[in-house]
Amino acid sequence: LKQMNIGNSSLTASEIVLGCMRISEMSVSELSRYIDEAIEAGITMFDHADIYGRGRCEELFGEVLASRPHLRERIHIQSKCSIRDGYYDLSKEHILTSVDGILKRLQTDYLDMLLLHRPDTLMELEEVAEAFDRLHASGKVRHFGVSNFNSMQIELLQAYVKQPIIANQMQFSIMHANLVTSGIQANTLFDGAPNRDGHILEYCRLKHITIQAWSPFQYGFFEGVFIDNEKFPEVNEVLGRIAEEKGVSKSAIAVAWILRHPANMQVIIGTTNSARLKDICQASHVQLSRQEWYEIYRAAGHRLP
């Protein structure tokens, strides 16, 4: 897999990230083997959140790390906090408590990156700044990012925190293409023209913030997978034809479509299937032409003015 710098930082990681939201039912030995398979495929970054499996995902990963002391230095781990039962919490106390819990479950003494999982409209920016200062000074967190933040939320946060925000996780896929559609359909009355994220794609490029695309195979908001879904015959026909020409799968083409964008995004995949993991990682070696990229985009039902 190709490696890339995250934001303007010294953190270098694979352009495909393994999301760990679904590992809670794996055994420690199964997860250990799976991590090895991911590393063999070229993946060096693993994505967690304190709510995944109600903490069990981090606990299992931590058991693997504890049984293999030299593994930690070979990989990058990021995790997220802010989502609680029925509300969001970016208070200083919750951020600090969350990180301590994350580190305890992962059985490590640092995170390569902490991301604020969802924007908390009640957050006191001075508190977030103090929490970041403590975490950075103590060595518990090396880099910081956000998730699902719009441009002005990042701008406001960055006005208070000293540490650069180097990543922003956003839902993005062929069928959930708001990030690009509002720009493509600018100055029209098309349904996709209204911008819902503060032009976050352009903002992140200007500020050298890496967008980490989550749910690359989903349509809607957790409505399901579009790959081989009979609801979407046209996009699957185009994906299938291009996949056959390139000698890879439809899923690999769907990821390659995201990686083709010059914003230099990372893609977070959440599979726990070894064969599918290796298959998707072939995306790193696929180069879509401009014509192919737009053909896939149009096949997904997105209009060009």
What are these regions (language model features)?
Residues 1-75, 137, 218-220:
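N-terminal binding-site loop/beta-alpha segment at the start of enzyme catalytic domains
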Residues 19-29, 81-93, 122:
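Active-site mouth loops of central-metabolism enzymes
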Residues 26-38, 90-106, 152-155:
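Short, acidic/polar
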Residues 43, 108-111, 141, 165:
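A structural motif
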Residues 103-124:
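Active-site groove signature of glycoside hydrolases
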Residues 123-305:
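Beta/alpha (TIM)-barrel catalytic core signal, keyed to glycine-rich beta->alpha loops juxtaposed to Asp/Glu
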